[in-house]
Amino acid sequence: MSKKDFENVTESKEILQFSELFQTGFGENVKYQLKIGEKGAFVFDRFLDHFIKFGIAVLNEQEIDECIMDSYIDNIIRQISKISMGTLMFEMYICREQGLLVGNNSNEEYVYYNTHFLGDKKYINELFEIYPCLERMIFESIFYLVNNYKELLIRLKKDHDYLVEQLCDRKKFKKVVKMQSDISDSHKRGKTVSVLTLDNDVKVVYKPRSLKGEKAYQDFQTYISQGSKLKARTFKVIDCGNYGWEEFVESKPCSDMQQLRNYYYRFGELILQNYILNANDLHEENVIAYGEYPIVIDAETILDNHIELSKQNSREIINEKIRDSVLFSGLLPNYRFSNKGKGIDMSAIMGKEGDEYPILIPRIAEIGTSNMHYEYVHPIKTANNNLATLNGKFIAPATFIKEIDQGFRDAYRFIMEHKQSTIEKMKIFENIICLLYTSDAADEL
């Protein structure tokens, strides 16, 4: 048995122990308070209540900042709601059809099901007998959350002095006053990026993965800017092996037209850099407009593998050309999420809020009633921090084609004049683990 197989077996046993511990009533007497005013009411809250109490008891942290506990509870709510919502709506519908719900209207019937059925732990156990995968997924989710939050707390304590020295300008801190942990997709057993606001007014970014790639990316960016008339701006990155900390980069507008021109000159350089590194997925969420500097805050998708297409039709021929061009990175305008000639621009240079996705996603309708059901809607894009602005006003990038072109040309010329040193510099990317983006490019035309 390999080490990985052994770890998987051990993990499965621990998740099973979570389920068995839940059956004993562990955590039932835990007291907690939800900030309903901030988060809004929760659907099927009596069902969630069982697992919030259990999750708090299992975390078993006596000294934990209030905002971290709030974040932990919020994650339990979001993840278990996502796992269980469809099943609970279906079971409520069955109870209604069998005449088991009491009430004069659909709202009262929902309240009855939520209170009398989901508040009864015996009923919860009956659901688990019918849906064993539901049980498995719920306790697996809690298991990962517990491990990930404990891991963060241990690392924050261990690295305290180093964070003060490197990211806090030597300003000491005692606690975290705000935590945001829903800013990225989760990977590798629920691990996700978090932004921590400390009581010294400094924000730090925690990433539960190696940041060797980010450090190499910034080092390479500094190297390329040697041939530029403008220097690149990097941000502080602390790589701790299998996790790391970063300086928080906040967007800000340009204060004059020259700064805006400088931004797009640097953007041209950025296009060249990511073309060389065969980077992709650098969409609007992964680039911050920091004054006259475009800052890539997630370089996890560099060094993408080239997937050879069969080129049996025009679509595959077009996709092959896109993959081999500067469009592949996602920095320049491109339309995604539709293969019918329509789509939305999610590029770092142009992606903006308010656009309607040309795809349908499920949303719950008639919330808080026994008629709850899924309906499919077109979601609307929300704002990001990728657009360069002048005193808060966005000016179309087409106005600055000359600057973009010049930045690209200067960086290209530097690379061509320093081929051997560039090849040597590329060795900093050896043995770096990157994220492979496997989306079908054909779906994005």
Q: For each predicted feature, which ranges?
A:
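General beta-strand recognition
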Residues: 205, 245, 295, 354, ...
